[in-house]
């Protein structure tokens, strides 16, 4: 897991090289670096998956626990959705025991409004 901290990305070339040598998957922890870039690419979109926290104290915080996972891998995306929705594949069909980790409408609305201000908040910190 690569952890980007204080708005600064870690050395993703080195992380990805080590992962490739050892056939490992890489998850980027982007919780404290929303909007940061590494060599012109947004963090979270470099490795196999990126995770973001929307805990109230974070740069983009909701008013309760919340988070997001991003990936370009369709299998990872499907499995993540299933885990977040009680292991459900389709209505009344659950492949495994998952959990309820869906973002509720109130938190989504709060984040939607705050997201419009994120870039200016980031710029004011620099």
Where are these regions (language model features)?
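Active-site region of PLP-dependent enzymes
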Residues: 33-39, 46-126
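Catalytic PLP-binding core of fold-type I/II PLP enzymes
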Residues: 1, 5-40
């Amino acid at each position: 897991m690569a952890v980007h901290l204080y708005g600064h990305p870690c050395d993703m070339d080195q992380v990805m090289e080590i992962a490739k040598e050892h056939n490992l998957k890489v998850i980027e922890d982007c919780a404290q670096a929303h909007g940061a870039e590494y060599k012109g690419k947004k963090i979270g979109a470099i490795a196999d998956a990126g995770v973001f926290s929307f805990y109230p104290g974070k740069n983009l915080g909701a008013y309760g626990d919340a988070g997001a996972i991003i990936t370009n891998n369709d299998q990872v995306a499907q499995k993540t959705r299933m885990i977040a929705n009680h292991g459900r594949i389709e209505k009344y069909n659950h492949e495994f025991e998952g959990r309820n980790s869906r973002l509720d409408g109130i938190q989504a609305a709060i984040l939607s409004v705050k997201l419009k201000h994120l870039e200016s908040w980031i710029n004011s910190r620099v």
